[in-house]
Amino acid sequence: MDIEQANQSAVTRMMEARPMLTGVAAARDVIPGMHSHLLLHAGPPIAWARMAGPLRGAMIGAMLFEQLAHTEAEAIALAESGGVQFEPCHEHNTVGPMAGVTSASMLVYVVENKPDTGSPNTAYSNLNEGYGKVLRYGAYSEEVLARLRWMNTVLGPTVGAALARSGGIDLRALIAEALHMGDEGHNRNKAGSLLFLKALAPLIAQVDGAAGSQSEVLKFLGDNALSVLNPVMAACKAMTDAAHGVAGSTLVTAMARNGTDFGIRVSGLPGQWFTAPAEIPVGLFFSGFSQADANPDIGDSAITETAGIGGFAMAAAPAIVTFVGGTPRDALNATLEMYEITSAEHKHFTMPALDFRGTPTGIDIRKVVELGIAPRINTGIAHKNAGVGQVGAGLVRPPMVIFEQALMAYAEKYGL
Protein backbone atom coordinates (compact mmCIF):
# COMPACT_ATOMS: atom_id res chain seq x y z
CA MET A 1 0.00 0.00 0.00
CA ASP A 2 1.32 3.43 -0.95
CA ILE A 3 0.36 5.82 1.86
CA GLU A 4 1.83 8.85 0.10
CA GLN A 5 -0.22 8.15 -3.00
CA ALA A 6 -3.37 7.72 -0.90
CA ASN A 7 -2.70 11.02 0.86
CA GLN A 8 -2.02 12.78 -2.43
CA SER A 9 -5.36 11.54 -3.73
CA ALA A 10 -7.19 12.68 -0.59
CA VAL A 11 -5.63 16.14 -0.38
CA THR A 12 -6.16 16.70 -4.11
CA ARG A 13 -9.85 15.92 -3.70
CA MET A 14 -9.97 18.37 -0.80
CA MET A 15 -8.25 21.19 -2.67
CA GLU A 16 -10.05 20.66 -5.98
CA ALA A 17 -13.50 20.60 -4.38
CA ARG A 18 -15.56 23.56 -5.61
CA PRO A 19 -18.27 24.25 -3.03
CA MET A 20 -21.16 26.35 -4.30
CA LEU A 21 -23.77 27.88 -1.99
CA THR A 22 -26.90 27.05 -3.96
CA GLY A 23 -29.85 27.45 -1.64
CA VAL A 24 -31.64 27.40 1.70
CA ALA A 25 -33.97 24.57 2.71
CA ALA A 26 -35.63 23.01 5.74
CA ALA A 27 -33.31 20.55 7.46
CA ARG A 28 -35.91 17.78 7.30
CA ASP A 29 -36.10 18.12 3.52
CA VAL A 30 -32.40 17.90 2.71
CA ILE A 31 -30.24 16.56 5.56
CA PRO A 32 -29.86 12.77 5.24
CA GLY A 33 -31.63 10.88 8.01
CA MET A 34 -33.22 13.98 9.56
CA HIS A 35 -36.54 13.51 11.36
CA SER A 36 -38.74 15.38 13.83
CA HIS A 37 -37.22 13.89 17.00
CA LEU A 38 -33.58 14.08 15.92
CA LEU A 39 -31.38 16.90 17.19
CA LEU A 40 -27.95 17.30 15.62
CA HIS A 41 -25.03 18.72 17.58
CA ALA A 42 -21.41 19.76 17.15
CA GLY A 43 -18.57 17.40 17.86
CA PRO A 44 -18.36 13.64 18.31
CA PRO A 45 -21.25 11.55 19.70
CA ILE A 46 -22.40 12.37 23.23
CA ALA A 47 -25.28 11.43 25.53
CA TRP A 48 -27.44 13.96 27.39
CA ALA A 49 -25.89 13.05 30.76
CA ARG A 50 -22.41 14.12 29.61
CA MET A 51 -23.36 17.33 27.79
CA ALA A 52 -21.83 20.60 28.95
CA GLY A 53 -23.96 23.61 29.88
CA PRO A 54 -23.94 25.38 26.48
CA LEU A 55 -24.90 22.21 24.59
CA ARG A 56 -27.64 21.29 27.06
CA GLY A 57 -29.08 24.78 26.82
CA ALA A 58 -29.07 24.67 23.03
CA MET A 59 -30.83 21.29 23.08
CA ILE A 60 -33.51 22.69 25.40
CA GLY A 61 -33.93 25.66 23.06
CA ALA A 62 -34.27 23.42 20.02
CA MET A 63 -36.94 21.30 21.74
CA LEU A 64 -38.86 24.47 22.62
CA PHE A 65 -38.43 25.81 19.08
CA GLU A 66 -39.76 22.55 17.60
CA GLN A 67 -42.58 22.49 20.19
CA LEU A 68 -41.48 19.04 21.28
CA ALA A 69 -41.64 20.56 24.76
CA HIS A 70 -43.32 23.69 26.10
CA THR A 71 -41.21 24.33 29.19
CA GLU A 72 -37.62 23.85 30.25
CA ALA A 73 -38.69 21.08 32.63
CA GLU A 74 -40.57 19.24 29.87
CA ALA A 75 -37.54 19.48 27.59
CA ILE A 76 -35.20 18.07 30.23
CA ALA A 77 -37.63 15.23 30.97
CA LEU A 78 -37.90 14.43 27.26
CA ALA A 79 -34.12 14.36 26.91
CA GLU A 80 -33.65 12.17 29.97
CA SER A 81 -36.35 9.72 28.87
CA GLY A 82 -34.86 9.14 25.43
CA GLY A 83 -37.77 10.84 23.70
CA VAL A 84 -35.36 12.63 21.37
CA GLN A 85 -32.22 11.41 19.63
CA PHE A 86 -28.88 13.21 19.71
CA GLU A 87 -26.41 12.65 16.86
CA PRO A 88 -23.37 14.51 15.51
CA CYS A 89 -23.87 16.98 12.68
CA HIS A 90 -20.83 15.42 11.02
CA GLU A 91 -22.60 12.07 10.62
CA HIS A 92 -25.32 13.82 8.60
CA ASN A 93 -23.15 15.86 6.16
CA THR A 94 -23.70 18.90 8.38
CA VAL A 95 -21.71 21.31 10.55
CA GLY A 96 -22.65 24.00 13.04
CA PRO A 97 -20.69 26.54 15.11
CA MET A 98 -20.41 26.24 18.92
CA ALA A 99 -23.25 23.95 20.11
CA GLY A 100 -24.16 23.44 16.45
CA VAL A 101 -27.68 22.29 17.33
CA THR A 102 -29.83 21.78 14.24
CA SER A 103 -33.43 20.56 14.31
CA ALA A 104 -35.86 19.35 11.66
CA SER A 105 -37.70 22.58 10.84
CA MET A 106 -34.69 24.89 10.96
CA LEU A 107 -33.59 26.31 7.64
CA VAL A 108 -30.07 25.40 6.54
CA TYR A 109 -27.63 26.48 3.87
CA VAL A 110 -27.16 23.97 1.05
CA VAL A 111 -23.59 23.81 -0.27
CA GLU A 112 -22.93 21.61 -3.29
CA ASN A 113 -19.43 20.55 -4.23
CA LYS A 114 -19.19 20.74 -8.01
CA PRO A 115 -15.60 19.72 -8.77
CA ASP A 116 -14.17 19.80 -12.29
CA THR A 117 -13.15 16.19 -11.74
CA GLY A 118 -14.29 13.69 -9.12
CA SER A 119 -17.62 13.00 -7.49
CA PRO A 120 -19.96 15.74 -6.25
CA ASN A 121 -21.19 15.86 -2.66
CA THR A 122 -23.33 18.17 -0.52
CA ALA A 123 -22.93 19.71 2.94
CA TYR A 124 -25.22 21.77 5.16
CA SER A 125 -25.03 24.33 7.96
CA ASN A 126 -27.56 26.25 9.99
CA LEU A 127 -27.95 30.04 9.67
CA ASN A 128 -25.88 32.37 11.84
CA GLU A 129 -27.83 34.11 14.62
CA GLY A 130 -25.47 37.03 15.12
CA TYR A 131 -24.29 38.13 18.56
CA GLY A 132 -25.57 38.28 22.13
CA LYS A 133 -28.01 35.75 23.55
CA VAL A 134 -28.04 33.01 20.93
CA LEU A 135 -28.91 29.32 20.76
CA ARG A 136 -25.41 28.25 19.76
CA TYR A 137 -24.15 29.37 23.19
CA GLY A 138 -27.00 27.65 25.01
CA ALA A 139 -29.50 30.51 25.42
CA TYR A 140 -33.17 29.64 25.03
CA SER A 141 -35.16 32.67 26.22
CA GLU A 142 -38.17 33.93 24.26
CA GLU A 143 -35.88 36.53 22.66
CA VAL A 144 -33.72 33.72 21.27
CA LEU A 145 -36.69 31.68 20.07
CA ALA A 146 -38.28 34.75 18.45
CA ARG A 147 -35.09 35.41 16.50
CA LEU A 148 -34.99 31.78 15.34
CA ARG A 149 -38.59 32.08 14.14
CA TRP A 150 -37.73 35.29 12.26
CA MET A 151 -34.76 33.54 10.68
CA ASN A 152 -37.07 30.74 9.54
CA THR A 153 -39.81 32.99 8.18
CA VAL A 154 -37.94 36.06 6.89
CA LEU A 155 -34.14 35.75 6.77
CA GLY A 156 -33.89 32.22 5.39
CA PRO A 157 -36.60 32.50 2.72
CA THR A 158 -35.23 35.88 1.57
CA VAL A 159 -31.65 34.63 1.28
CA GLY A 160 -32.92 31.44 -0.35
CA ALA A 161 -34.86 33.39 -2.96
CA ALA A 162 -31.79 35.53 -3.64
CA LEU A 163 -29.61 32.46 -4.06
CA ALA A 164 -32.15 30.98 -6.48
CA ARG A 165 -31.57 34.04 -8.69
CA SER A 166 -27.79 33.88 -8.34
CA GLY A 167 -26.91 30.54 -9.85
CA GLY A 168 -24.95 29.90 -6.67
CA ILE A 169 -22.08 31.62 -4.86
CA ASP A 170 -18.61 30.13 -5.38
CA LEU A 171 -17.42 29.79 -1.79
CA ARG A 172 -13.94 28.60 -2.70
CA ALA A 173 -13.41 31.83 -4.61
CA LEU A 174 -14.93 33.87 -1.77
CA ILE A 175 -12.60 32.28 0.80
CA ALA A 176 -9.58 32.80 -1.45
CA GLU A 177 -10.41 36.50 -1.84
CA ALA A 178 -11.11 36.97 1.87
CA LEU A 179 -7.67 35.54 2.72
CA HIS A 180 -6.20 38.38 0.63
CA MET A 181 -8.28 40.90 2.62
CA GLY A 182 -7.19 40.06 6.16
CA ASP A 183 -9.48 37.15 7.09
CA GLU A 184 -8.41 33.66 8.15
CA GLY A 185 -11.89 32.13 7.73
CA HIS A 186 -12.67 31.02 11.29
CA ASN A 187 -12.51 33.73 13.95
CA ARG A 188 -12.06 36.64 11.58
CA ASN A 189 -14.64 36.81 8.79
CA LYS A 190 -15.10 40.55 8.34
CA ALA A 191 -14.02 40.63 4.70
CA GLY A 192 -15.78 37.38 3.81
CA SER A 193 -19.04 38.56 5.34
CA LEU A 194 -18.87 41.79 3.34
CA LEU A 195 -18.17 39.81 0.16
CA PHE A 196 -21.14 37.61 1.03
CA LEU A 197 -23.36 40.66 1.51
CA LYS A 198 -22.04 42.21 -1.72
CA ALA A 199 -23.04 39.08 -3.65
CA LEU A 200 -26.48 38.86 -2.06
CA ALA A 201 -27.57 42.50 -1.77
CA PRO A 202 -28.63 43.19 -5.39
CA LEU A 203 -30.53 39.90 -5.45
CA ILE A 204 -32.21 40.47 -2.08
CA ALA A 205 -33.41 43.84 -3.39
CA GLN A 206 -35.31 41.97 -6.13
CA VAL A 207 -37.02 39.51 -3.78
CA ASP A 208 -40.73 40.00 -3.21
CA GLY A 209 -41.59 40.13 0.47
CA ALA A 210 -43.28 42.01 3.24
CA ALA A 211 -42.67 45.75 3.28
CA GLY A 212 -39.28 46.44 4.81
CA SER A 213 -38.19 42.81 4.99
CA GLN A 214 -35.39 43.26 2.46
CA SER A 215 -33.82 46.13 4.39
CA GLU A 216 -34.27 44.17 7.64
CA VAL A 217 -32.39 41.21 6.17
CA LEU A 218 -29.65 43.41 4.69
CA LYS A 219 -29.13 45.14 8.04
CA PHE A 220 -29.02 41.82 9.90
CA LEU A 221 -26.40 40.43 7.52
CA GLY A 222 -24.43 43.68 7.44
CA ASP A 223 -24.31 43.99 11.23
CA ASN A 224 -22.97 40.45 11.63
CA ALA A 225 -19.29 39.96 10.83
CA LEU A 226 -19.89 36.22 11.25
CA SER A 227 -22.67 35.97 8.67
CA VAL A 228 -20.48 34.05 6.23
CA LEU A 229 -19.00 31.69 8.85
CA ASN A 230 -21.75 29.09 8.50
CA PRO A 231 -21.60 28.85 4.68
CA VAL A 232 -17.79 28.76 4.91
CA MET A 233 -17.99 25.92 7.42
CA ALA A 234 -20.32 24.00 5.11
CA ALA A 235 -17.89 24.66 2.26
CA CYS A 236 -15.03 23.25 4.33
CA LYS A 237 -17.20 20.26 5.24
CA ALA A 238 -17.86 19.62 1.55
CA MET A 239 -14.12 19.85 0.86
CA THR A 240 -13.08 17.51 3.66
CA ASP A 241 -15.89 15.03 2.98
CA ALA A 242 -14.62 14.83 -0.60
CA ALA A 243 -11.35 13.55 0.90
CA HIS A 244 -12.98 11.11 3.32
CA GLY A 245 -12.89 7.37 2.77
CA VAL A 246 -9.70 7.15 0.71
CA ALA A 247 -8.24 3.73 1.49
CA GLY A 248 -4.83 4.01 3.11
CA SER A 249 -4.96 7.77 3.72
CA THR A 250 -3.71 9.11 7.06
CA LEU A 251 -5.23 12.58 6.58
CA VAL A 252 -7.66 14.08 9.08
CA THR A 253 -11.08 14.85 7.58
CA ALA A 254 -12.83 16.25 10.66
CA MET A 255 -11.90 17.93 13.93
CA ALA A 256 -14.90 18.65 16.12
CA ARG A 257 -15.75 19.43 19.75
CA ASN A 258 -18.96 19.11 21.75
CA GLY A 259 -17.94 20.98 24.90
CA THR A 260 -16.95 17.76 26.64
CA ASP A 261 -14.93 15.74 24.11
CA PHE A 262 -12.69 16.54 21.16
CA GLY A 263 -12.98 14.12 18.24
CA ILE A 264 -11.27 13.55 14.91
CA ARG A 265 -12.05 11.43 11.86
CA VAL A 266 -9.45 10.07 9.46
CA SER A 267 -9.87 9.52 5.72
CA GLY A 268 -8.64 5.92 5.69
CA LEU A 269 -10.65 4.98 8.80
CA PRO A 270 -14.24 5.82 7.83
CA GLY A 271 -16.96 5.31 10.42
CA GLN A 272 -14.68 5.85 13.41
CA TRP A 273 -14.24 8.70 15.89
CA PHE A 274 -11.14 9.12 18.05
CA THR A 275 -11.96 11.14 21.15
CA ALA A 276 -10.54 12.50 24.40
CA PRO A 277 -11.57 15.25 26.84
CA ALA A 278 -11.59 18.69 25.19
CA GLU A 279 -9.11 21.29 26.39
CA ILE A 280 -10.12 24.73 27.67
CA PRO A 281 -9.06 27.44 25.19
CA VAL A 282 -6.59 30.09 26.33
CA GLY A 283 -7.05 33.62 25.05
CA LEU A 284 -8.45 37.09 25.66
CA PHE A 285 -11.65 37.56 27.65
CA PHE A 286 -14.36 40.17 27.50
CA SER A 287 -14.61 42.59 30.42
CA GLY A 288 -15.87 40.87 33.56
CA PHE A 289 -14.89 37.34 32.50
CA SER A 290 -11.80 35.22 33.04
CA GLN A 291 -10.32 31.81 32.30
CA ALA A 292 -12.36 30.41 35.20
CA ASP A 293 -15.58 31.11 33.26
CA ALA A 294 -14.53 29.20 30.13
CA ASN A 295 -16.19 26.00 28.96
CA PRO A 296 -14.03 23.31 27.35
CA ASP A 297 -13.65 23.69 23.60
CA ILE A 298 -16.91 23.42 21.61
CA GLY A 299 -18.06 23.57 18.00
CA ASP A 300 -17.68 22.11 14.51
CA SER A 301 -15.88 25.23 13.31
CA ALA A 302 -12.48 23.50 13.48
CA ILE A 303 -13.55 22.08 10.12
CA THR A 304 -11.96 25.30 8.81
CA GLU A 305 -8.52 24.29 10.09
CA THR A 306 -9.12 20.77 8.76
CA ALA A 307 -9.57 22.29 5.29
CA GLY A 308 -6.47 24.50 5.53
CA ILE A 309 -7.79 27.86 6.76
CA GLY A 310 -8.60 29.25 10.24
CA GLY A 311 -5.64 28.78 12.57
CA PHE A 312 -3.64 27.37 9.65
CA ALA A 313 -4.02 30.67 7.76
CA MET A 314 -3.28 33.10 10.60
CA ALA A 315 -0.45 34.61 8.56
CA ALA A 316 -3.17 36.08 6.34
CA ALA A 317 -4.89 37.77 9.28
CA PRO A 318 -2.41 39.57 11.56
CA ALA A 319 -5.17 41.71 13.07
CA ILE A 320 -6.76 38.58 14.58
CA VAL A 321 -4.28 38.74 17.45
CA THR A 322 -6.27 41.62 18.93
CA PHE A 323 -9.08 39.08 19.39
CA VAL A 324 -7.33 35.80 20.24
CA GLY A 325 -4.12 37.10 21.81
CA GLY A 326 -0.47 37.22 20.79
CA THR A 327 1.41 39.32 18.24
CA PRO A 328 1.41 39.47 14.44
CA ARG A 329 4.69 37.53 14.54
CA ASP A 330 2.89 34.80 16.52
CA ALA A 331 0.24 34.62 13.80
CA LEU A 332 2.93 34.18 11.17
CA ASN A 333 4.72 31.51 13.19
CA ALA A 334 1.45 29.64 13.79
CA THR A 335 1.01 29.14 10.06
CA LEU A 336 4.66 28.20 9.52
CA GLU A 337 4.44 25.54 12.22
CA MET A 338 1.42 23.91 10.56
CA TYR A 339 3.44 23.18 7.39
CA GLU A 340 5.31 20.64 9.54
CA ILE A 341 2.24 18.41 9.98
CA THR A 342 0.46 18.78 6.64
CA SER A 343 0.85 17.10 3.28
CA ALA A 344 0.32 19.97 0.82
CA GLU A 345 0.14 23.69 0.18
CA HIS A 346 -3.31 24.74 -0.98
CA LYS A 347 -3.64 25.50 -4.67
CA HIS A 348 -6.38 28.09 -4.22
CA PHE A 349 -5.94 29.50 -0.69
CA THR A 350 -2.82 31.69 -0.62
CA MET A 351 -1.41 34.27 1.80
CA PRO A 352 0.14 37.59 0.69
CA ALA A 353 2.38 37.80 3.79
CA LEU A 354 4.09 34.56 2.76
CA ASP A 355 4.63 35.62 -0.87
CA PHE A 356 1.29 34.01 -1.76
CA ARG A 357 2.33 30.60 -0.49
CA GLY A 358 -0.58 28.17 -0.24
CA THR A 359 -2.00 27.49 3.19
CA PRO A 360 -0.85 24.28 4.94
CA THR A 361 -3.47 21.67 4.06
CA GLY A 362 -4.09 18.02 4.86
CA ILE A 363 -3.25 17.17 8.49
CA ASP A 364 -1.29 13.89 8.56
CA ILE A 365 -1.73 11.91 11.79
CA ARG A 366 1.73 10.36 11.26
CA LYS A 367 3.44 13.74 11.27
CA VAL A 368 1.42 14.97 14.26
CA VAL A 369 2.51 11.98 16.35
CA GLU A 370 6.10 11.83 15.08
CA LEU A 371 6.78 15.54 15.68
CA GLY A 372 4.57 15.99 18.72
CA ILE A 373 2.90 19.01 17.10
CA ALA A 374 -0.88 19.21 17.44
CA PRO A 375 -2.94 21.39 15.08
CA ARG A 376 -3.60 25.01 16.08
CA ILE A 377 -7.21 26.12 16.24
CA ASN A 378 -8.65 29.63 16.58
CA THR A 379 -11.87 29.55 18.54
CA GLY A 380 -14.52 31.50 20.34
CA ILE A 381 -14.73 30.77 24.06
CA ALA A 382 -18.14 29.90 25.51
CA HIS A 383 -19.16 30.46 29.13
CA LYS A 384 -19.50 27.16 30.96
CA ASN A 385 -23.07 28.00 31.97
CA ALA A 386 -25.86 27.74 29.40
CA GLY A 387 -26.99 30.97 27.82
CA VAL A 388 -24.32 33.36 29.13
CA GLY A 389 -22.78 33.38 25.67
CA GLN A 390 -19.35 34.11 24.29
CA VAL A 391 -16.89 35.36 26.90
CA GLY A 392 -13.76 35.61 24.79
CA ALA A 393 -11.69 34.10 22.02
CA GLY A 394 -8.39 32.33 21.88
CA LEU A 395 -6.34 29.36 20.78
CA VAL A 396 -6.57 25.67 21.53
CA ARG A 397 -5.00 22.42 20.37
CA PRO A 398 -6.56 18.96 20.26
CA PRO A 399 -5.34 16.41 22.82
CA MET A 400 -2.39 14.51 21.34
CA VAL A 401 -3.80 11.16 22.48
CA ILE A 402 -6.51 11.16 19.80
CA PHE A 403 -3.91 11.22 17.04
CA GLU A 404 -2.06 8.39 18.77
CA GLN A 405 -5.31 6.41 19.01
CA ALA A 406 -5.99 7.00 15.33
CA LEU A 407 -2.49 5.94 14.29
CA MET A 408 -2.76 2.72 16.31
CA ALA A 409 -6.16 1.97 14.75
CA TYR A 410 -4.70 2.67 11.31
CA ALA A 411 -1.78 0.31 11.94
CA GLU A 412 -4.18 -2.40 13.10
CA LYS A 413 -6.53 -1.99 10.13
CA TYR A 414 -3.80 -1.99 7.51
CA GLY A 415 -1.56 -4.56 9.19
CA LEU A 416 1.42 -2.28 9.73
What are these regions (language model features)?
Residues M1-L416:
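Anaerobic metallocofactor- and corrinoid-dependent redox/one-carbon enzyme cores
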